[in-house]
C-alpha cells in the first residue's frame, strides 16, 4: 500500500525548529513526507536536517531538478500539504496567489487539503490584513489552525505561538482521513459546548456530573478538519485544547450560557454537547461546610438553572442558524428523546443511553440523531469522531 504523501512546508520563523517534531510524527506514523522550506526557513534549520529526518531529498528552489518540474509536480502528487510554521508573509502570499518560490508554487498546484499552522507576534496575527488573509484561505477550504497563547520571540507573550506539534499532527490526521472531500464547513463559524458544569456548594464541594467532554472535543476537531472556524466552550474537561480551535473555559451553567450566547452571535451552527446542570444551590457558603456531630446537616436548597438549549432554539442569533442538542437518557430513549426535542425546539437532538459502563469517559459512542422534521439517523457503536461526522453531515444539509 502506498504511503500517504505529505508536503511539509516550512516558512521562516523561530518556530521552524518545532517542525522537526511534526516531521518525526508524520514519518513515524507511516507518511511519505517531502519538506519544502523557504529560503528564510533555512536560516533556522538547514536542508541536511530536513533530509535526514524525512528520508527524502529536500527541494528549496524552483530551479532544482528542472527536468522534473518540481514547482508543479510536488503539489500535484501530494495527499496533504501542511505549512508549519506559516508566517504572516506566507499566509499573505497564499491568500493572494503569489508564486515567487517553491512553497508558494506548491500551494497553487496542490489539489489536496491544505493546513496552515500560523506562528507570529500577536500584533501581526491581529492585524486586519492578516485577519482578512486568514478569512480568505478558510473560505477557499484551507484549514487555518488558531495559534496558541504563550511565550513568543524575545520577552513578548500573547497569541501567536505555534501550536504544539502533537496537536498539528492530530489535525493533519483528521484532514487526511477525510481525504479530498469538500471542506463543507469552510467559511462557517460553529460553536460547540463540551464537558460538564459544576455548581459550587462551598470552596471545596460542588454539584456536578460525569461528562468527560470527549464527544464535544471530537465535534470540535472534526468541524475544524471540515474547514470551520470553531469556538469550543469547555466546562471542566481536563482535556488538551484541540489545535485549530478557539477554546473558552467555563465552570458553571451561568458562565457557560454567557460564553455560548456571546460566541453564537455570528455562528452558523451551535452544538450543545455539554452536560449542563439543571439546578444549582441557592446559596454559596464562603467557607467549607463543617460536619456537626450532634446535628443533621442543613438541607441544600436548589434553584433552577437557565435552559440554554431552549433559549438558543427560541431566540436564534441569526436567520438560518442550526441548533443541535444532546440528551443522555437511562431508559425509553426514543420516547424521551422525541419529547425533549419538541420541548427544546432545536433542529437536531443527539440521544444516547447512559449508565454504568456506558458512554461516560469512553472513546466510543452510539446514538440516535432525531430531527425536528421527523427524521431518525441511527449511529452504530464506534469512535466518537464517527458520531461527530454524522452530526456535521446533518448540520451541513440543513445549512445548505
Predicted regions and their residues:
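A cross-family phosphate/adenosyl-ligand binding-site feature
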Residues: 1-400
Amino acid at each position: 500500500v502506498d504511503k500517504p504523501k505529505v508536503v511539509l512546508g516550512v516558512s521562516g520563523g523561530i518556530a521552524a525548529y518545532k517542525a522537526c517534531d511534526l516531521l518525526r510524527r508524520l514519518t513515524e506514523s507511516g507518511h511519505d513526507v517531502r519538506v519544502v522550506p523557504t529560503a528564510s526557513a533555512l536560516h533556522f534549520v538547514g536542508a541536511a536536517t530536513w533530509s535526514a529526518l524525512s528520508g527524502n531529498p529536500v527541494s528549496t528552489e524552483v530551479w532544482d531538478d528542472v527536468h522534473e518540474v518540481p514547482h508543479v509536480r510536488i503539489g500535484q502528487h501530494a495527499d496533504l500539504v501542511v505549512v508549519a510554521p506559516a508566517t504572516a508573509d506566507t499566509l499573505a502570499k497564499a491568500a493572494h496567489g503569489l508564486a515567487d518560490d517553491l512553497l508558494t508554487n506548491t500551494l497553487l498546484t496542490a489539489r489536496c487539503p491544505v493546513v496552515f499552522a500560523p506562528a507570529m507576534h500577536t500584533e501581526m496575527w491581529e492585524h486586519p490584513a492578516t485577519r482578512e488573509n486568514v478569512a480568505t484561505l478558510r473560505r477557499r477550504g484551507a484549514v487555518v489552525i488558531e495559534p496558541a497563547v504563550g511565550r513568543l520571540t524575545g520577552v513578548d507573550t500573547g497569541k501567536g505561538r505555534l501550536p504544539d506539534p502533537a496537536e498539528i499532527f492530530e489535525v493533519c490526521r483528521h484532514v487526511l482521513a477525510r481525504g479530498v472531500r469538500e471542506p463543507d464547513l469552510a467559511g462557517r463559524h460553529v460553536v460547540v459546548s463540551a464537558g460538564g458544569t459544576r455548581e459550587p456548594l462551598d470552596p471545596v464541594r460542588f454539584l456536578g456530573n460525569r461528562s468527560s467532554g470527549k464527544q464535544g472535543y471530537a465535534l470540535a476537531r472534526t468541524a475544524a478538519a471540515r474547514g470551520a472556524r470553531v469556538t469550543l466552550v469547555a466546562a471542566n474537561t481536563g482535556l488538551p485544547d484541540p489545535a485549530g480551535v478557539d477554546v473558552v473555559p467555563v465552570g458553571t451553567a451561568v458562565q457557560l450560557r454567557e460564553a455560548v450566547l456571546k460566541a453564537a452571535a455570528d455562528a452558523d451552527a451551535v452544538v450543545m454537547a455539554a452536560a449542563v446542570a439543571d439546578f444549582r444551590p441557592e446559596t454559596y457558603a464562603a467557607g467549607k461546610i463543617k460536619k456537626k456531630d450532634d446535628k443533621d446537616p442543613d438541607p441544600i436548597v436548589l434553584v433552577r438553572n437557565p435552559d440554554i438549549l431552549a433559549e438558543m432554539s427560541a431566540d436564534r442569533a441569526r436567520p438560518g442558524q442550526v441548533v443541535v442538542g444532546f440528551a443522555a437518557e437511562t431508559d425509553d430513549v426514543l420516547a424521551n428523546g422525541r419529547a425533549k426535542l419538541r420541548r427544546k425546539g432545536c433542529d437536531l437532538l443527539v440521544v444516547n443511553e447512559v449508565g454504568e459502563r456506558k458512554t461516560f469517559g469512553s472513546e466510543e459512542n452510539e446514538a440516535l440523531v432525531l430531527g425536528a422534521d421527523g427524521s431518525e439517523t441511527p449511529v452504530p457503536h464506534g469512535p466518537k469522531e464517527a458520531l461527530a461526522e454524522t452530526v456535521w453531515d446533518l448540520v451541513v444539509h440543513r445549512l445548505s
